[in-house]
Amino acid sequence: MLADFKKATDALQKAVEMNPSSSDYYLWLGRAWGRRAEAASPFTAPLHAAKARQAFERAVQLDGRNLEAINDLFDYYLEAPGFLGGGLDKAAALAERIGQLNPAEYHYAEAKLFDKRNEHSAAEQHFRRAVQLAPRQVGRLIDLARFLAKQGRVQESDAVFEQAQKLAPDSPKVLFWRAKTYVQEGQNLDKAQKLLKRYLQSDLTPDDPSRQEAEKLLRKSMGA
């Protein structure tokens, strides 16, 4: 796996050198470095993470309206420690930029900020507002369902997942995140296994959780 991620970063590094004004290429390079950081040792992961941040920042500099790049940089700032260039103040500033481009995404970003600060009531309000603004976007429902599950409100979470599955019956993301929620909560494990098996038979995109992650989750659901 590490070899695959190295090939990806090497190829994308060449791509940005040939197309230095491409915001999207820098975005993809940042994602590749991020995946490489996740799979790396504790000694090399910080270096890879820093390269991911630099690529995301460059992508946003090149195109201030590249919402995917802004979102990825927001997530980096939200989750990374300060010594790696993260920080809630930086994330909050980016959330305001997101608001200028997409109101639903803005409320999702605000929800994550409040959740990070353990202000769960405010976070829920923003998650629900994001759903109201984009009722046909299945991702907004998944976000709300995952949040509710994390709060221990499993029945409410399952009802929202059911709503998402009716909206997009064959969505791989719904299958995966619903199954993962069941496994994390230790409930409906038989159903989780069926969902994961369907997921593994689906046509996945690079934006979907990896097959390896789904297989690992399936083994966990079976007690392995």
Range-by-range predicted roles:
Residues S23-D24, L67-E68, P103-Y106, V138-G139, ...:
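Helix-start (N-cap) detector for alpha-helical repeat units in TPR-like alpha-solenoids
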Residues G86-D89, R97-R117, T181-A224:
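Terminal, low-structured helical/coil segments at or just beyond the last alpha-helical repeat
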Residues P20, G64, Q100-P103, P135, ...:
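Short coil turns that delineate tetratricopeptide repeat
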Residues F5, A39, A49, L88, ...:
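TPR-repeat structural position
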Residues M1, R35, A39-P42, E79-A80, ...:
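Register position in tetratricopeptide repeats
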Residues K14-A15, R58-A59, A95-I98, R129-A130, ...:
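Canonical positions in the second alpha-helix
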